[in-house]
Design a protein with these regions (language model features):
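Macromolecular interaction modules
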Residues: 1-104
C-alpha cells in the first residue's frame, strides 16, 4: 500500500510569513521534484498556528523509507533548509505506511 513522509516544523510567529512564502515557492516544489513523490501537500495546524505540516505521498513504504532514511535527495534538502533557517525551526520527520484506506 501507499506511504507518506510527514514533516512537521515548529515555526516562530515572527518567521511564519517568510517561511510560508519560501516553502510555497521554493521548498515544496523542490522536494516534490527531488523525491519524485506522487503528490506533495502542506498546511498549518488550525489549533496550533506555529505548526506547519508537509505531506509527501509515495506508492509504497519502501520508496518513502528510501527517501527519508538518508537519501542524497533528503540530505541535500535538509542542508538547504538549515542554510536558510539555521537553527530557528525545529522539525521532525515520520514515515507512515498505509495499512487501511476507505473512500467515499
Amino acid at each position: 500500500m501507499s506511504a507518506y513522509l510527514i514533516v512537521r516544523a515548529q515555526v516562530a510567529p515572527e518567521d511564519r510569513e517568510a517561511f510560508d512564502h519560501w516553502y510555497q515557492t521554493e521548498h515544496l516544489p523542490d522536494a516534490h521534484a527531488a523525491f519524485k513523490s506522487l503528490s506533495a501537500q502542506r498546511g498549518w495546524v488550525e489549533d496550533n498556528p506555529s505548526l506547519h505540516v508537509a505531506i509527501y505521498a509515495f506508492s509504497d513504504l519502501a520508496e518513502a523509507q528510501a527517501i527519508a532514511n538518508g537519501s542524497p535527495q533528503i540530505t541535500e534538502l535538509i542542508a538547504e533548509f538549515d542554510r536558510v533557517w539555521q537553527d530557528r525551526i525545529h522539525r521532525t520527520r515520520e514515515v507512515v505506511g498505509v495499512v487501511q484506506s476507505l473512500q467515499r
